[in-house]
A protein has these predicted regions:
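N-terminal signal-anchor/initial transmembrane insertion module
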Residues: 1-69
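Residue-level micro-sites within transmembrane alpha helices that shape
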Residues: 43, 100, 225-228
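Hydrophobic alpha-helical transmembrane segments of polytopic
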Residues: 36, 40-47, 90-97, 120, ...
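Intramembrane catalytic core of multi-pass membrane enzymes that act on lipidic substrates
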Residues: 32, 56-141
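Juxtamembrane membrane-interface segments at transmembrane-helix boundaries in membrane proteins
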Residues: 20-39, 67-85, 147-157, 205-212, ...
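Hydrophobic transmembrane alpha-helices
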Residues: 1-4, 51-54, 125-127, 142-286
């Protein structure tokens, strides 16, 4: 499973030649569309729930007993640098990331979300399930299970955690900058409706070129920050941690063509001159 999960990258290769991506700003009108908030939360939460199930059940089947609660929290790594401390960090990072990404972001933080086509939902659901099984199996018993197996690279854990934290916070910052564009549109439309005495049935989606933080140089800075986040997570687990490495490679091969596709969308909607030299994802490079 660890090795074959990389085949997901081959499936997403179609994005290099097709601009058809019925989600987000490139969503399409379809009778089969799924509500954006519900679609995002369900396809992301499936992997998260599966990961938790594996972490609870697999250790018993392998005769390892119950994993301590510290394995489920990032704080565990600050308490002890022994035994399952790396699993503590890795599991805590995954839990926190997906609580933000699968629950808080779509259901509570995003003012609105474009509909998702079932085709995208199915592919994303499959990706999450493969990812959860790959990572969950590794962390719950098929990877290193003793402090001796982790001791040789314990010095990289802190650096990896710092990189992961920076990537997550930067990703959240840039995500919120995109949300503020929608919130500003929401406030403006509601104010106009209140002045006219008319009810607000729905808020029209407004698209602008984001300009804060790394958005000054990259149109998809939030993608780049997520790559950095998971590169740090891979470092925490060690360079030989195949599920972490494979996950990062899948993220890059999936999100890079999407970013290039998004740049073409921005150029078509606003014109190349309005982008002021911004790259698709890596400032000054690509």
């Amino acid at each position: 499973m660890f090795q074959r999960f990389l085949t997901c990258a081959k499936i997403t290769a179609a994005q290099w030649v097709l601009d058809w991506y019925p989600q987000g700003k490139t969503s399409i009108e379809s009778r089969f569309n799924i509500n954006g908030k519900i679609g995002w939360a369900t396809m992301e939460s499936a992997g998260f729930i599966t990961l938790l199930y594996i972490m609870y059940s697999l250790p018993k089947e392998l005769g390892l007993g119950e994993l301590p609660w510290g394995n489920w929290t990032m704080a565990g790594c600050f308490v002890s640098m022994e035994g399952g401390s790396v699993r503590n960090v890795l599991m805590g990072c995954k839990v926190f990331h997906y609580l933000y990404r699968a629950v808080a972001s779509p259901l509570f933080l995003n003012p609105s979300m474009s509909p998702i086509h079932p085709f995208v939902w199915i592919l994303a659901f499959g990706f999450q399930m493969f990812n959860a099984i790959s990572i969950g199996g590794y962390l719950a018993g098929y990877g290193p299970t003793s402090q001796y197996e982790w001791a040789a690279r314990s010095e990289y854990m802190f650096l990896g955690l710092v990189i992961w934290c920076w990537g997550l916070l930067a990703n959240m910052f840039h995500d919120d900058d995109l949300r503020e564009i929608r919130r500003a549109a929401d406030r403006k439309q509601r104010k106009a409706a209140a002045e006219q005495g008319t009810p607000v049935e729905k808020v029209d989606k407004i698209y602008m070129i984001p300009k804060n933080g790394l958005f000054k140089y990259s149109l998809h800075a939030h993608y780049l920050c997520e790559w950095i986040e998971w590169a740090g997570w891979w470092m925490i687990g060690g360079w030989q941690c195949v599920p972490a490495r494979t996950f990062l490679l899948n993220e890059i091969t999936t999100m890079l063509p999407r970013a290039l596709q998004g740049k073409r969308w921005y150029e078509k909607k606003f014109g190349k001159d309005k982008l002021q030299g911004r790259k698709a994802i890596i400032p000054g490079v690509l």
